[in-house]
């Protein structure tokens, strides 16, 4: 699933090609995403000038003159710029045609993504209750410490809760906990403030590094230019169960936490 760095990489890739452009047409080949694409999307977006391309959590907000297109990439979605005349392949469900002769093409093999229209996107039910951005000024380890008091749930699903902080998915939660030396199974309420301060720093550092590397390409993700990300080369634990720890050489363990695979080092993480 594309996580925050992959979505931000996509935003940075498509923004220069969209802002200031006018939409000439929206071609929808298949409306059946996680929620059906609005039947009037072509009417709403055609003729509109695109004013900004923003991100909130894992949602892309393509702001036009009279509203905003909310896009979620789901499990396997991607957005990239193509020549408007290029034929669509299987799973390429939507083209937003631009006056420049390019098209913003949405591909989603598993169709778990979304394209929705909103006049007030930040008040939309999908975005209104989200926590702070992990790279913003409202997030730090103190917030994690405060919200964790009295919580018995494991720390990994705690930091993956979008009400606590957005965009810390399975890949980056695993990597941040390893970097901070925290066992992902440890109860959130049992972790000291000092360790949470370290964890907050590692979340910010690792997400920033992943964005710089263009995200993590594990299966379907490509950036807005169609190129893969390279952060997978930096992974210490995610997807490496049974392999050796790059820090101490012991065997990494794989467990299930909150219905997700979690890999950790029993020697480095306490």
UniProtKB/Swiss-Prot annotation:
Record-level Gene Ontology MF annotations: 8-oxo-7,8-dihydroguanine DNA N-glycosylase activity; class I DNA-(apurinic or apyrimidinic site) endonuclease activity; damaged DNA binding; zinc ion binding
Keyword Lyase attributed: yes
FPG-type ZnF: 236-270
Cited SMART domains: Fapy_DNA_glyco, H2TH
Residue positions binding DNA: 91, 110, 151
UniProt EC number: 3.2.2.23, 4.2.99.18
Swiss-Prot/TrEMBL GO biological process terms: base-excision repair
Gene3D superfamilies (alphabetical): 1.10.8.50, MutM-like, N-terminal
TM spans (from-to): none
InterPro entries in alphabetical order: DNA_glyclase/AP_lyase_DNA-bd, DNA_glyclase_Znf_dom_DNA_BS, Formamido-pyr_DNA_Glyclase, FPG_cat, MutM-like_N-ter, Ribosomal_uS13-like_H2TH, Znf_DNA_glyclase/AP_lyase, Znf_FPG/IleRS
Alphabetical UniProt keywords: DNA damage, DNA repair, DNA-binding, Glycosidase, Hydrolase, Lyase, Metal-binding, Multifunctional enzyme, Zinc, Zinc-finger
Subunit-structure text: Monomer.
Protein name per UniProt: Formamidopyrimidine-DNA glycosylase
Species per Swiss-Prot/TrEMBL record: Stutzerimonas stutzeri (strain A1501) (Pseudomonas stutzeri)
Gene name of this polypeptide: mutM
């Amino acid at each position: 699933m594309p996580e925050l760095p992959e979505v931000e990489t996509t935003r940075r890739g498509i923004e220069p090609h969209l802002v200031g452009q006018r939409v000439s047409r929206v071609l929808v080949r298949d409306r059946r995403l996680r929620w059906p694409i609005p039947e009037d999307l072509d009417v709403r977006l055609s003729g509109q000038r695109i004013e900004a391309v923003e991100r909130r959590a894992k949602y892309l907000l393509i702001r036009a003159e009279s509203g905003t297109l909310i896009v979620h990439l789901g499990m396997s979605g991607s957005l990239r710029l193509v020549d408007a005349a290029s034929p669509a392949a299987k799973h390429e469900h939507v083209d937003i045609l631009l006056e420049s002769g390019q098209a913003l093409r949405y591909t989603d093999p598993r169709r778990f993504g979304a394209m929705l229209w909103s006049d007030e996107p930040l008040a939309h039910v999908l975005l209104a209750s989200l926590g702070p951005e992990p790279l913003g000024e409202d997030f730090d380890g103190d917030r994690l410490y405060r919200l964790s008091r009295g919580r018995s749930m494991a720390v990994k699903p705690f930091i993956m809760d979008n009400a606590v902080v957005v965009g810390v998915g399975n890949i980056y939660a695993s990597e941040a906990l390893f970097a901070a030396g925290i066992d992902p199974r440890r109860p959130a309420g049992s972790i000291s403030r000092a360790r949470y301060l370290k964890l907050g720093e590692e979340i910010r550092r690792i997400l920033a590094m992943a964005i710089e590397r263009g995200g993590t390409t594990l299966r379907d993700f490509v950036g807005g230019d169609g190129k893969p990300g390279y952060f997978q080369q930096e992974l210490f634990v995610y997807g490496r169960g049974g392999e050796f720890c790059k820090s101490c050489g012991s065997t990494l363990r794989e467990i299930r936490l909150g219905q997700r695979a979690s890999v950790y080092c029993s020697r480095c993480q306490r």
